[in-house]
């Protein structure tokens, strides 16, 4: 099972020219449900639609009892936890994370999220490159 993802999943105002500065409130950006998640949503705060040529800056929010099942992506993830606590499994290793923790998830590495104390929020930076999310089947 696979799920396509990317910055084009979120509608924005017209893109400024590449290299133009962008300043806006995160609350002005719509939060969209993560289709494969439980009580999980994402905002694309900055990306190619805003003229950012190299990276996509996203904010994820998961409520108590929420999470995202084990999956892989074709791009690396750099993450910074804003609030809440979660159990994140990366390549089979379980980590409990909370505010001010940072994570690096290499491309192609299986990872999942399970909220321990919600809401759980984190910033996720990914390269502006094609990505495909693939769910990892249990027991494999």
Model-derived segments and their meaning:
Residues 92-107:
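Short acidic-glycine-tyrosine-enriched beta hairpin
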Residues 75-86:
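Glycine- and acidic-residue-biased ligand/ion/polar-headgroup-sensing regions
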Residues 58-73, 107:
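Conserved short histidine dyad/triad with adjacent acidic residue
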Residues 74, 93, 109-110, 118-119, ...:
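A generic "binding-loop/recognition-motif" signal
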Residues 60, 85, 93-95:
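Well-ordered beta-strand scaffold positions
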Residues 69-70, 88-89, 105, 111-117:
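Short beta-strand His + acidic residue motifs that chelate non-heme Fe in jelly-roll/DSBH
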Residues 1-54, 137-140:
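A short, N-terminal "cap"/entry segment at the start of jelly-roll beta-barrel domains
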Residues 59, 104, 118-134:
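A short hydrophobic beta-strand segment most commonly corresponding to one strand
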């Amino acid at each position: 099972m696979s799920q396509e993802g990317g910055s084009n999943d979120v509608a924005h105002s017209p893109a400024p020219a590449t290299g133009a500065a962008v300043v806006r409130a995160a609350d002005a950006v719509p939060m969209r449900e993560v289709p494969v998640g439980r009580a999980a949503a994402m905002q694309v705060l900055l990306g190619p639609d805003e003229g950012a040529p190299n990276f996509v800056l996203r904010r994820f929010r998961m409520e108590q009892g929420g999470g995202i099942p084990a999956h892989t992506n074709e791009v690396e993830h750099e993450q910074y936890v804003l609030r809440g606590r979660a159990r994140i499994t990366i390549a089979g290793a379980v980590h409990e994370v909370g505010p001010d923790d940072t994570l690096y998830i290499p491309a192609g590495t299986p990872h999942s999220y399970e909220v321990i104390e919600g809401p759980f929020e984190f910033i996720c930076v990914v390269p502006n490159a094609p990505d495909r999310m693939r769910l990892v089947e249990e027991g494999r």
